[in-house]
Amino acid sequence: MVKLRLKRCGRKQRAVYRIVAIDVRSRREGRDLRKVGFYDPIKNQSCLNVPAILYFLEKGAQPTGTVRDILKKAEVFK
């Protein structure tokens, strides 16, 4: 099963997260299937590849709670 979840990047005390499609059995920092966006919680900024996100959601991918909140804020779910 595939999930849309956050992958931590950046440096200490300055985290930036990539939103990735990844196998549910993989570690947080494991190999992802595809990068579909990023989220910066400090600047409260996000950039999303909406067609790729919709593709994975149509194929049955489940977003985690935090990713679901980011997608709702960006109005991906209409």
From Swiss-Prot:
Gene Ontology process terms (BP): mitochondrial translation
InterPro entries according to UniProt: Ribosomal_bS16, Ribosomal_bS16_CS, Ribosomal_bS16_dom_sf
Annotated localization: Plastid, Chloroplast
Origin: domain of life: Eukaryota
Signal peptide range: none
Entry's family note: Belongs to the bacterial ribosomal protein bS16 family.
NCBIfam families tied to this protein: S16
Protein name, per record: Small ribosomal subunit protein bS16c
